[in-house]
Amino acid sequence: MNIFEIQQSKQDKEFVMKNGSLEFEVFADILKTADDIPYIGSLFKLSKVAVNYMDYRFVRKLHFFLVESENIEPERKEKFLNSLDEKDYKRINAMMTHLLYSAGEDGKATLMGKIYRSRLLGEIDDEMMLRLCSVVNRAFLADLEHLEEYVKPNPEDNYITSNLYSFGLLRLKGPEVVERTLNVGGQYEVNEVGRLLMRIMRE
């Protein structure tokens, strides 16, 4: 499956945008008429007895992902795709498809869509797009809402802090030598990657 080709295919994109947010049962009925849609039609083997629920979930997440860049000019999307050589095109498409397919929540697809939009607008580069989407894929979405609490150095050290730190969104402002000896002190503060994600989340 190629999310870039789906984005560029008028038939596929229209199908995803129109039907991707439907409930499974309704979607399964509509899909019976989708055999002429190039990429989505091939994803769902229509000869199967039942629609694969995971594939349905992928199309649903793809809907929320694409919604975020719907208002971006086609020229910007073309410019982004044309900037990729064959190797990077395959690598980035494979990673983005995997991250989107394995995302556990629709909200993650929405946030990945916002990250992709930032890339199309030239606000971040390819590697930062992949880094941020990878963080979103692995994170518990509600934890990301707590990033604002670390704009200023925060001594709080709980499971949310641990999660955000492990995802590379916080930096530890180390304690003084005496405090390290006593195993106390130290404050967490959002780093550059975390600030980028915060900004994108606000959009």
What are these regions (language model features)?
Residues D12, D29, D35-D36, D55, ...:
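Acidic-enriched, low-complexity/disordered segments with a strong bias for Aspartate over Glutamate
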Residues A94-E203:
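Long, helix-rich, hydrophobic modules that act as membrane-proximal anchors or helical bundle/coiled-coil regulators
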Residues F4-F64:
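Membrane-inserting effector segments that mediate pore formation, membrane fusion
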Residues V16, S47-K61, E73, L81-L84, ...:
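The feature marks long, low-complexity, polar/acidic/proline-rich intrinsically disordered regions embedded
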Residues D55-I124:
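Membrane-proximal, non-transmembrane interface segments of integral membrane proteins
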